[in-house]
Amino acid sequence: MSTAVRPDEVSSILRKQLAGFESEADVYDVGTVLQVGDGIARIYGLSKVAAGELLEFPHNVMGMALNLEEDNVGAVLFGESNAVKEGDTVKRTNILASIPVGEAMLGRVINPLGEPIDGKGPINTDIRLPLERRAPGVIFRKSVHEPLQTGLKAIDAMIPIGRGQRELIIGDRQTGKTAVALDTIINQKGKGVQCIYVAIGLKGSTVAQVVNTLEKYGAMEYTTVVSATASDPAPLQFIAPFAGATIGEFFRDTGRHALVVYDDLSKQAVAYRQLSLLLRRPPGREAYPGDVFYLHSRLLERAAKITDDIEVAKKMNDLPEPLKPLVKGGGSLTALPVIETQAGDVSAYIPTNVISITDGQIFLESNLFNAGQRPAINVGISVSRVGGAAQIKAMKKVAGTLRLDLAQFRELEAFSKFGSDLDKSTKAQLDRGARLVEILKQGQYIPMPVEKQVAIIFIGTQGLLDSVDLKQVRRFEEEFLAMLEQKHPEILSSIAEKGTLESDIASKLKELGEKYVASFKEKSKA
């Protein structure tokens, strides 16, 4: 006998079924590829897409929306554009381009999307921050006042860099720009500064060499390398510096110190020019787009020294949600952008732009490099606009006369080429200048602690080296500093701890210098 279903049962079954029904359907905003080529895709649809939003193409290729036009969207592809074809479906991801950050990034080599490329497995970090972010406002900053020692005598004495500063390294190819940046990274060992090295458009072999150098000197443990090599697509070279800045900002906003090296921004500008022309943006001077200045200014303005007041720091503009509970005051992000000039032309478009954005520049010259002066810094036209406030008192004291002596030496040297009969005082000045130039020479990857720099520059500016043979100056420096370290460590530790050159220490140093010069000359004769 069949049992009849009662109407009230039917209604209760229907109610149960309806209660479990999800009324919301997943709505995907999708578009269609109209045209693709040269790493650029034109997409129809995606009417609600945001500028800088990540897009998902077939075959796991990611892209980013850059041009939002009336009837289509211009996007750049972060992978092989051969995998994408006309008519393909493109999905919005609803997330702006971002990168993982945190301590787990240290010691790793990544691409600009935050994916590891060093074969050491995945990176375990939960925090992701957007690539593009507004720089901190004036209220949240503090003036630069702590030194960032590079370990290079010529820079720390005459072109000092402070934490939170932007100092440009500029010069022709093969003048030692990368070497200056790497020396600075190696010198941060044990100083609590996290470093980020961004390689833009360099050869893959060069990046591998940089990583090997950093590993050899134990610097990789506090360094992240962001690599967009010459073989990577232009969009990756364009976003690489922003990825480096974002990793550095995590340390800056959590009350720590970070140093980011962009090597080099001229290649980023070329990649951006390529993208802009392919997106049919109007070209300007040297065919660069009109906003190439803004490209570099918005990047370099993110380097800052943050206020010590934690309550003010917590209200920082554009602070991403994951960072809010971690914010501390007093952090800094220092930027060392690198620009390559063509035949020493610093008045070209990109060099003048970046010179005007940064707080000073270090000029490296090929003729000085070829003459054996390394680092090949032209002290006359190199400048640090804010670093003076960050220099330790001891260095300020000895370096003031150094800059003046060198300037006079350069002037006299130019005149002395014309005349052979020089008076005694001119000859003495030329001799001292030549020895000071010799002191400032330094080997690669052997940064010097600031207290040793102060000691040897003091000996040079006091004229104690005037009687030492020019060819023996480097040997004298090595032996004198080794003697100080072994027999008189209290002198070096006093300079290091107090940051000043006390009068009693100065007179003791001078006395030791005079004695050592005499014994050194005796030894040399023998």
UniProtKB/Swiss-Prot annotation:
<dbReference type="InterPro" id="IPR020003">
    <property type="entry name" value="ATPase_a/bsu_AS"/>
</dbReference>
<protein>
    <recommendedName>
        <fullName>ATP synthase subunit alpha</fullName>
        <ecNumber>7.1.2.2</ecNumber>
    </recommendedName>
</protein>
<dbReference type="InterPro" id="IPR033732">
    <property type="entry name" value="ATP_synth_F1_a_nt-bd_dom"/>
</dbReference>
<keyword id="KW-0067">ATP-binding</keyword>
<keyword id="KW-0406">Ion transport</keyword>
<dbReference type="InterPro" id="IPR038376">
    <property type="entry name" value="ATP_synth_asu_C_sf"/>
</dbReference>
<dbReference type="InterPro" id="IPR036121">
    <property type="entry name" value="ATPase_F1/V1/A1_a/bsu_N_sf"/>
</dbReference>
<keyword id="KW-0139">CF(1)</keyword>
<dbReference type="InterPro" id="IPR005294">
    <property type="entry name" value="ATP_synth_F1_asu"/>
</dbReference>
<dbReference type="InterPro" id="IPR000793">
    <property type="entry name" value="ATP_synth_asu_C"/>
</dbReference>
<keyword id="KW-1003">Cell membrane</keyword>
<feature type="site" description="Required for activity">
    <location>
        <position position="382"/>
    </location>
</feature>
<keyword id="KW-0813">Transport</keyword>
<dbReference type="InterPro" id="IPR004100">
    <property type="entry name" value="ATPase_F1/V1/A1_a/bsu_N"/>
</dbReference>
<keyword id="KW-0472">Membrane</keyword>
<keyword id="KW-0547">Nucleotide-binding</keyword>
<dbReference type="Pfam" id="PF00306">
    <property type="entry name" value="ATP-synt_ab_C"/>
</dbReference>
<keyword id="KW-0066">ATP synthesis</keyword>
<keyword id="KW-0997">Cell inner membrane</keyword>
<dbReference type="Pfam" id="PF00006">
    <property type="entry name" value="ATP-synt_ab"/>
</dbReference>
<dbReference type="InterPro" id="IPR027417">
    <property type="entry name" value="P-loop_NTPase"/>
</dbReference>
<comment type="function">
    <text>Produces ATP from ADP in the presence of a proton gradient across the membrane. The alpha chain is a regulatory subunit.</text>
</comment>
<dbReference type="InterPro" id="IPR023366">
    <property type="entry name" value="ATP_synth_asu-like_sf"/>
</dbReference>
<dbReference type="GO" id="GO:0005524">
    <property type="term" value="F:ATP binding"/>
</dbReference>
<comment type="subunit">
    <text>F-type ATPases have 2 components, CF(1) - the catalytic core - and CF(0) - the membrane proton channel. CF(1) has five subunits: alpha(3), beta(3), gamma(1), delta(1), epsilon(1). CF(0) has four main subunits: a(1), b(1), b'(1) and c(9-12).</text>
</comment>
<keyword id="KW-1278">Translocase</keyword>
<dbReference type="GO" id="GO:0005886">
    <property type="term" value="C:plasma membrane"/>
</dbReference>
<dbReference type="GO" id="GO:0045259">
    <property type="term" value="C:proton-transporting ATP synthase complex"/>
</dbReference>
<dbReference type="GO" id="GO:0046933">
    <property type="term" value="F:proton-transporting ATP synthase activity, rotational mechanism"/>
</dbReference>
<dbReference type="Pfam" id="PF02874">
    <property type="entry name" value="ATP-synt_ab_N"/>
</dbReference>
<comment type="similarity">
    <text>Belongs to the ATPase alpha/beta chains family.</text>
</comment>
<feature type="binding site">
    <location>
        <begin position="171"/>
        <end position="178"/>
    </location>
    <ligand>
        <name>ATP</name>
    </ligand>
</feature>
<keyword id="KW-0375">Hydrogen ion transport</keyword>
<dbReference type="GO" id="GO:0043531">
    <property type="term" value="F:ADP binding"/>
</dbReference>
<dbReference type="InterPro" id="IPR000194">
    <property type="entry name" value="ATPase_F1/V1/A1_a/bsu_nucl-bd"/>
</dbReference>
